[in-house]
Amino acid sequence: MKTWHMVVVIGFLATLAQTSLALKEEDCEVCVKTVRRFADSLDDSTKKDYKQIETVFKKFCKTQKNKEHRFCYYLGGLEESATGILNELSKPLSWSMPAEKICEKLKKKDAQICDLRYEKQIDLNSVDLKKLKVRDLKKILNDWDESCDGCLEKGDFIKRIEELKPKYSRSEL
């Protein structure tokens, strides 16, 4: 009887340990969010065929920027990708595996996939632009796909951001 209780307790603890080791979204945020967004964009007929998923993913990758573009590079979704582990994404997606589990498998193949992190967004309504570095001001403009031709000094970048702020910054009412 004691042996049976011990087996049950060990089984319970093993299950508990397994669930606590499962990958969380914040551990691999770029992967999880990109896989979810991609999976949501697929129609039902495409979701069943992993070859079609790979083709659609390559098209999807052509439109990605920044961290998502790097994620595509690591998976082999870009023409210039050095390696290709695309089937580690496409096959589990065709089985309707959740994004967290897919990213867990991808992390085992290539750990740098989960090293990708989104940069913290700057709240333009509360930040003092004069206190930011020029690098951060350039990043704001770059994120907006805007340029600042002829900007040499910090004041020039701040002026350009202030001009564009109404277009890109929507304050909650």
From Swiss-Prot:
Keywords: Developmental protein, Disulfide bond, Secreted, Signal. It is found in: Secreted. Its main location: secreted. One of its GO terms (biological process) is dopaminergic neuron differentiation. InterPro entries: ARMET-like, ARMET_C, ARMET_N, EF_Hand_1_Ca_BS, SAP_dom_sf. One of its GO terms (cellular component) is extracellular space. Residues 1-22 form the signal peptide. Disulfide bonds join 28-114, 31-103, 61-72, 148-151. Transmembrane segments: none annotated. It comes from the Eukaryota. Belongs to the ARMET family. Required during the maturation of the embryonic nervous system for maintenance of neuronal and cuticular connectivity. Essential for maintenance of dopaminergic neurons and dopamine levels. This is Mesencephalic astrocyte-derived neurotrophic factor homolog. The lineage of its organism: Eukaryota, Metazoa, Ecdysozoa, Arthropoda, Hexapoda. The gene is Manf.
